[in-house]
Each structure stands twice: as C-alpha cells, then as structure tokens.
C-alpha cells in the first residue's frame, strides 16, 4: 500500500514539475511574443513646414505667435531648442536632409539645382526611397522635395521622385495641389521685388479651400486606416512660405494695430563684413519701411504660421484617433528659418541665427520622454542617420554625413562637443555651438557671436582678440570639401 502511495505521489510530483516547466515555457513564449510586438517597426509621420522660423510658441521667437498644436506636440516628446538647417534655402536644405549629404559635398546650394541631375547622388539613396527599400509603405503629400513658388508653372511638380512612393497626393508626378490666390496680386507689396510674389493678404475663402488643407485631408485618411506594412508618411505644409495668403480668420487673430515688430537694432549691419552686407542687398527692407508695411508683413507671417499650426493639429488629431497612434514616431521640422527685418534682411539665404535656427520636435514612444528639451546643437542633416537607428534599418549605400542623435532622444542629455554647420553658397559657412556662432565667408571675412550674452547677434566679436581661441577652434570644424555649384545660380533663384 505504501509503495502504491509513493508511486502515486511521485507521479503527482512529476506532473507538477511538468506543469511548472510548461508554464515557464509559455511565459517565456508570451514574453518573447510581447517583445516582438513592441519591437515591430515604428511608423513614421514626417511633417515638413516650409520657411518655419523660431516664431513657434515653445521657442519664444515672437511673443504673439499662436501655435498651440506645435506647442502640444513639443510637450509629448523632445524639443530641440538649438536645431539648425544645413542650408538656408528650400532646395539645398531639403536635398541635404533627404540625401544625408552636405551642400558642400553635392554642390547643391541653390533652388535651381535639381538633385536628380548630379552624378554625385546617382548612387545615393534618399530617405523615402531607403524606407521603401527596407519594406516600408511610403506615402507622401505636399512639398517634401523642393517645388517652385506657385506662381511658376513648374510649381506643381517640383523635384520629386515618383519611384520612391507607393502613393502621393495629388499624384506621383505632382507634389502640390493648385493654390488659392487673390484675383489681383500683389495686394500689399510691389512687383518691383520678387515679381510681386513677396506679398500678404487675407483671402475670403474657407480653410478647406487652401492647398495645404487638401494635402492634410488626404494625409488624415491615410492615418485613419491600417496598412499591411509599416508606414512612412511624409506631409509637406507650404505655409508660412510666401506669399502669406490665408483665410481672413487667421489675420483676424492678429489685429494690425497690436502687432509687435521683431527685436532689431537700427544699425545692426554696421559691424558686418562686406560679404555679409551683400545678403541684404535686395532693398526689401528699405521698401517695407518706406511704405509703412513692416507690421503688415509681420501680420501676414503670423497669420500664415497660425494656419500652418492648425494643419499640424489636424494631422495629430487624425493620428491620435486612428489605429497607428501607439507605434508612430512623429518628426516635425522646418526646412530653414526666416528674417522679418532683423539685420535689415527679409527672407532666408543668410547665415545668421534667424535664418538657420529651425523647430525640430521628435516624439518617439520607445525613445523620448514627454516635456523634455535639449539645447545641444543638432542639424537637420542628422535626421537621416537618426531614423535609420530608430527604425533599425540597414545603412544606405552612401556614407551619411550627419550624426545620429538617438542617444539624445533617449536621455535628452548633452555630448562633449557637437556643432551644427550651415552652408550658403560655395565656401560660406556658419558653425553653431552651444554658445557661439562663427561665420566665415569665401573671401575670409568673419563674424562671431556669443549667444549667452548676445542672443540677437547684435555685436560681431570676430575682431576681438579675446575670442581668438574660440574662433580658431570653430573655424577648424568648417568642411574642407567645397564642391563647385551644380549649376550657375539663376537671377530668379529666390523662391
């Protein structure tokens, strides 16, 4: 009887052991399955905003800016407060970001330089194409690659690459939908400069009639449904690029009598070298001041910016309400900054802070912490290698010249040294460190600013011997490769 009881007990013990083992195996399998689920490739929502300077609320560029949606996005993740473009012009900046190569490497400095025509980038794979090659579904809408001003017949197509996309709005061969324009233009400026394209005015139309609204409406549909592959969705918002036309309600948010001009110094160009003064030679500032249009232009920019922010809000709401929200990394970036009278300069195409500094916000569920800021200098050139790491992709065939900032996403800390370099034309460069901006032009002339004591860059310290060591160090970081321009710049190359 005892033997039978022992045998029965042994069987029970062995059975219990088997159950424990099976339970452990099941738990391990479940954990592995969960780990696999967590590590599934993230979707990417890639939002490009044209001519977006630091007048975003969270960056404090202008006290009257109304950008609640971009501000809320910054609270969801990491805001880079010291991010800069690689070139202060639409085409050169975007080509550099999308190719992962410096303008000084490609020779693409101007808006007229079609990246598709240079042999140097024939073997390079641009960012959307790389995502497609790595198994992503690539969708796009609006301006990602450069497109001409919408007064130009080439505006609708631009320099896009049809083979990189599974679908594009309005079409694979047309980046931009037709834009709403006043019956007669210019409304407030003059055809004497920029052919009248530099203009601003309210439009008596609904928001949904704007080209950007059509782009965003299409993108919202893509965010509302599931896809059979991880999704790379690029959305290009054209405002606040000139002309600053927007529905009336956006102008109403900024009554002209209450408009504040940007902080400026009347004689701010006095200590600039001749090469720098050449950047203000278009005389737009003189015309605007003489015709009492400075406040009107600022109102136009603020209105267009507010409209663009509403478009960003539409995208974020669609993402949050759709099936992709939990596994989507969001990147919002401006292609370059913009002057509105600072240093008597209007537009971009310069190497000062107002032109190079851009909003850059990253929200990555597995990598970023809400409500964090990072003042380490980063470049838009760094986005390509960062996304390769975030999505665990293979490297593209070209050697990317940017530096991944994935480590900054994870801890929003700092590195021993990191700088952002901006190039305007051949051999004109700016180096931005955490505290200083150093500019050297092709003729050897220089500028140096200390942002700790001079955030508006009103005092050029380049001739102050006390800063010689700092200047020498920053100069040593300037690119040594300075390729000739791909094509001669065109006189009309200002869009």
Q: What is each PLM-predicted segment?
A:
Residues 2-18:
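Bacterial N-terminal signal peptides that target proteins for export
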Residues 15-27:
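Bacterial N-terminal signal peptides
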Residues 34-441, 445-446, 455-480, 486-495:
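Formylglycine-dependent sulfatase
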Residues 1-2, 495:
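Accessible peptide chain termini
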């Amino acid at each position: 009887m005892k033997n039978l009881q022992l045998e029965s007990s042994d069987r029970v013990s062995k059975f219990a052991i088997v159950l424990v083992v099976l339970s452990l195996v099941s738990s391990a399998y479940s954990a592995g399955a969960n780990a696999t689920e967590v590590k599934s490739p993230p979707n990417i929502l890639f939002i490009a905003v044209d001519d977006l300077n630091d007048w975003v609320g969270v960056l404090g560029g202008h006290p009257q800016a109304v950008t609640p949606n971009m501000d809320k996005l910054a609270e969801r993740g990491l805001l880079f407060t010291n991010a800069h473009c690689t070139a202060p012009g639409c085409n050169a900046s975007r080509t550099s970001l999308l190719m992962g190569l410096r303008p000084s490497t490609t020779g693409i400095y101007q808006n007229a330089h079609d990246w598709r025509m240079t042999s140097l980038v024939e073997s390079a794979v641009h960012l959307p194409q790389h995502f497609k090659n790595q198994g992503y579904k690539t969708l796009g809408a609006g301006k990602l690659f450069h497109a001409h001003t919408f007064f130009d017949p080439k505006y609708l197509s631009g320099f896009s690459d049809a083979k990189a996309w599974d679908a594009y709005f309005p079409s694979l061969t047309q980046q931009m939908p037709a834009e709403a324009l006043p019956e007669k233009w210019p409304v407030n400026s003059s055809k004497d400069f920029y052919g009248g394209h530099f203009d601003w005015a309210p439009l008596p139309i609904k928001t949904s009639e704007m080209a950007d609204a059509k782009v965003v409406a299409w993108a919202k549909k893509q965010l509302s449904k599931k896809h059979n592959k991880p999704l790379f969705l690029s959305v290009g918002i054209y405002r606040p690029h000139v002309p600053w036309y927007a529905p009336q309600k956006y102008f109403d948010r900024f009554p002209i009598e209450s408009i504040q001009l940007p902080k400026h110094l009347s004689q701010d160009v006095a200590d600039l070298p001749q090469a720098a003064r050449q950047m203000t030679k278009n005389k737009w500032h003189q015309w605007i001041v003489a015709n009492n249009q400075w406040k009107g232009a600022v109102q136009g920019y603020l209105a267009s910016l507010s409209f663009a922010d509403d478009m960003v809000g539409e995208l974020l709401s669609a993402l949050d309400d759709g099936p992709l929200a939990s596994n989507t990394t969001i990147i919002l970036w401006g292609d370059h900054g913009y002057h509105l009278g600072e240093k008597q300069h209007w537009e971009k195409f310069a190497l000062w802070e107002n032109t190079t500094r851009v909003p850059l916000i990253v929200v990555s569920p597995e990598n970023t912490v809400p409500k964090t800021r990072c003042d380490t200098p980063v470049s838009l050139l760094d986005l390509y290698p960062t996304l390769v790491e975030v999505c665990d992709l293979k490297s593209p065939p070209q050697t990317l010249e940017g530096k991944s900032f994935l480590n900054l996403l994870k801890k929003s800390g700092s590195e021993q040294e990191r700088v952002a370099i901006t190039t305007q034309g051949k051999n004109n460069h700016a180096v931005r460190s955490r505290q200083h901006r150093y500019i050297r032009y092709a003729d050897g002339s220089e500028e140096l600013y200390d942002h700790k004591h001079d955030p508006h860059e009103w005092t050029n310290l380049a001739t102050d011997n006390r800063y010689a060591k700092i200047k020498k160090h920053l100069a040593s970081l300037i690119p040594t490769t300075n390729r000739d321009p791909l094509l001669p710049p065109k006189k009309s190359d200002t869009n």
